Amino acid sequence: MQTFVLLALVAACSAAVIQVPTHKTESLRAKLIKEGKYTAFLASQHAARAQQLNTGFQPFVDYFDDFYLGNITLGTPPQPATVVLDTGSSNLWVIDAACKTQACNGYPDSGYTKQKFDTTKSTTFVKETRKFSIQYGSGSCNGYLGKDVLNFGGLTVQSQEFGVSTHLADVFGYQPVDGILGLGWPALAVDQVVPPMQNLIAQKQLDAPLFTVWLDRNLQIAQGTPGGLITYGAIDTVNCAKQVTYVPLSAKTYWQFPLDAFAVGTYSETKKDQVISDTGTSWLGAPNTIVSAIVKQTKAVFDWSTELYTVDCSTMKTQPDLIFTIGGAQFPVKSVEYVLDLQLGGGKCALAVFSMGSGGFGPSWILGDTFIRQYCNVYDIGNGQIGFATAVHKGL
């Protein structure tokens, strides 16, 4: 995978607006299905998840499909890394150069060789005695904490605390990533690490304490493509409509807020639920009853071999909208966003929805990239709110 250049638009001397292009990866799910390896992969994931049932409060991350990457550097001189830009977690971590496992190196058939961080080659790295361990939905990583100079998009944090991973779950070995940069709230951070965004705000490096995510759309998600733009310090007025609907956050852990109502076809639900916006989750997560309603309204069929709900690809543009009511406004998601061509064969496409279970103490919904591609998300840290504006896509 080729790296890409970060574009920095510097404003005043004391603060800035920074626009960082993202890159959308090839879908791991589509790749494994195409190579006939998906069934074995599912079995390994089920075994891993069975061991994670008692992990408690952890970030929501799903790296099975298209997700969005950015370039950073760490250390002096700078060492590059390509990381997931993830609003569903709050820690930054990269891979230790001393880790020699296949997961740390990248599996040969992943088509990507990991960029690792060599602490011995940075004159500004400070190793801490504290260890770190993070359990994500798709696997874990652990190692030790340290501090060094972080740069992303022309923004610099002089002493950013981050994880240096000495062990990665196998799933990360299949992905073209070198780490994760969490954009969630400090309360979600493991080991009370201060996230990069909070450090930037404290150092008054941004025009405004917010960032905007615009994700581009490609009907064929099996291949990696340019993925969108993150604007730090301002609202993206080029790729997002001018009208922004804001809603106060109901918790400052995830980017969590209330969902007033949901409808699809002839089905509607007015029970209020808690939902999170998460760039690290590819699809839409919903309660069991909602997933069942979507399946019924779209006439989807469950494919046991892939554990996916499928419909005919010919219906990609004609299935009913998924209509979310947030802050008193309706946000319809077109079927072209939630019916995905994963090259399953037989003219079948997948529904980009998954079950969150039947409820509990946490959020009941995840609005992942399927929703964010249709609506720019404005993550307003300063005012404790999130905003939504219609995304502009050329040629679609």
UniProtKB/Swiss-Prot annotation:
Entries under InterPro entries matching the protein: Aspartic_peptidase_A1, Aspartic_peptidase_AS, Aspartic_peptidase_N, Pepsin-like_dom, PEPTIDASE_A1, Peptidase_aspartic_dom_sf
The entry's keywords: Aspartyl protease, Cytoplasm, Disulfide bond, Glycoprotein, Hydrolase, Lysosome, Necrosis, Protease, Secreted, Signal
EC number: 3.4.23.-
Main subcellular location of this protein, as a coarse class: cytoplasm
Residues of the signal peptide: 1-15
GO cellular component: cytoplasm; external side of apical plasma membrane; extracellular region; lysosome
Assigned protein family: Belongs to the peptidase A1 family.
Annotated protein name in UniProt: Aspartic protease 1
